[in-house]
Amino acid sequence: HGLHWNTQVFDVSSGDIRHIGIREEFGIVIAHELLDDIPATIVEYDEFLTPRIVLVDPESGHEKMGEPLSGPELDWLKIWWPATVPLARREIGTTRDHTWIQLVNIFGTGRAIAIDYSHSLDQRSQGLWDAGTLAGYQHGRSVRPVPNGKVNITAHVSLDSCASAAATSRSDLTRTQEFDSDPTRSDFRWLVQDFGSRP
């Protein structure tokens, strides 16, 4: 189990991409179902529509409402996943935005592609995802998302927010495109962003 690199077939380097000196080269970054595994703060609106951080016991999975959300995460929430009704849940996207910014800045010129479970601002504003998207998987089966280190915990990604964050990070953005990867479902999407111009 885990991540393994096959370096016998292709001439590639393995290791931490941040320490490989290719910043000025043209390249392509593909994040396939990566961002949905990045940890995110979970909040739930109380009866006054105040978003409160959901605290979880890592062994039992028991949840309780914590302190109100604040700072950059609250700013993100107001823009990208506004309040609808009490008890609605949200996964805050700031950590995914930050990860995507790091990925699009690996190369000086190139293309960054994210392929992931996602939702749009229009869908979120309509309340279509008010139950949240937090899910847990173990040995290929859906299980309760208990953060005990044994369960793979995922949540859908706000790819539109990631795209906006990357555009703010790099002034040489030349193209952004989002589209469904499967016409039969609207929650598995591609984000493609091009930066700079290839010589």
Task: Give short role names for the model-derived ranges.
Residues 10, 31-32, 115:
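Short His-Asn-centered micro-motif
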